[in-house]
Amino acid sequence: DSDSYSKQQLDDLFMDMIAYYDGDPKRIQHFTKVHSYARLIGIGEELDDASLFILEAAAYTHDIGIRVAEEKYGRCDGKLQEQEGPIIAQKMLSQLGFENYIVERICFLIGHHHTYDNIDGLDYQILVEADFLVNLYEDDAGNRAIDKAYKRIFKTETGKKIFRLMFGYEED
């Protein structure tokens, strides 16, 4: 039922993530943008309510492992984010009353969002596309990286459309 997928829980999670990244506006801006694109693509691809809810929560929390990775290892590459993130997210999501099966899927997505060769669902595909849309811009990617990302990563019609418009990209 749609009560399980409450807007209030997502808003509470948004505030908790802002607090989690206290003093780090760049990371707050990043997950906010990833969430916006993830939601837009999810709606465009007609995700069911449960999948959209999971996607939105995963978009807010996808990089939650960064801080711990930096503290423990002095760096925060994708693999370390995937390794450290789920534990922190599991605690935060459970405290906010997210149901177990939802927490499990979100933690799976956090633990795999830099792994592109075994995408097992539309929620996962869209999270990766949204993260790429934001990262390509934030990292000031060149034309080769943009071309490669489009061909290798983007599968949804909505994600491809946003990509083409954002980067003025024309398919071969």
Annotate each language-model stretch with its function.
Residues 9-33, 65-75:
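Active-site flanking loop/helix segments enriched in acidic
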Residues 1-5, 22-32, 36-48, 61, ...:
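Divalent metal-dependent phosphate-bond-processing catalytic cores, especially two-metal-ion Mg2+/Mn2+ enzymes
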Residues 34, 79-95:
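An active-site-proximal "capping" alpha-helix that borders the catalytic cofactor pocket
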Residues 21, 42, 68-72, 93, ...:
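Short amphipathic alpha-helical interaction patches enriched in hydrophobic/aromatic residues
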Residues 92, 96, 104-109:
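Mid-chain, well-packed structural core segment of small domains
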Residues 52-74, 85, 107-114, 131:
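His-Asp-centered metal-binding catalytic motifs of divalent-metal-dependent phosphohydrolases/nucleases
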Residues 16, 37, 88-92, 129:
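A general alpha-helix detector
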